[in-house]
């Protein structure tokens, strides 16, 4: 079995951002030489997410609005975690809700997506250095 491990590093300009990382994931799949297998893409921080969805700016804004309005409003006084001196409980809850990692099938050496699917990094507490692991496995 072949395998490849690669890390993507991010320092976002904003506290919250959604970044399309599909091209980087596809490049690592190609570099690995795996024709049939899986690629795991995982945020290595507990205040970030990796997810699959559509690359459409209106949807991105809808996601951010949903997280702020329904899931985990950025209200430091609302969370017990913030009583410890932290201010990012909302980011932890957003990561928990959106998801921490994805596994994408590889078929004929390429990411095997449905229509419109892309891989995204969701930063919920940014402006500092963070990373994502890409782990390609297969034959």
Where in the sequence are the language-model features?
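Active-site histidine-anchored catalytic micro-motif
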Residues: 1-139
């Amino acid at each position: 079995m072949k395998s490849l491990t690669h890390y993507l590093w991010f320092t976002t300009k904003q506290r919250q951002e959604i970044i399309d990382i599909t091209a980087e994931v596809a490049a690592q799949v190609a570099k690995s030489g795996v024709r049939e297998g899986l690629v795991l893409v995982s945020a290595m921080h507990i205040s970030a997410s990796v997810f699959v969805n559509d690359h459409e700016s209106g949807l991105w804004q809808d996601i951010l609005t949903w997280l702020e309005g329904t899931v985990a409003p950025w209200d430091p006084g609302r969370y017990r975690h913030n009583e410890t001196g932290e201010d990012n409980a909302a980011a932890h809850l957003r990561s928990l809700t959106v998801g921490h990692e994805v596994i994408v099938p590889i078929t004929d050496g390429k990411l095997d997506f449905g229509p419109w699917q892309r891989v995204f990094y969701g930063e919920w507490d940014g402006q500092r250095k963070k990373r994502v692991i890409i782990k390609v496995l297969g034959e």
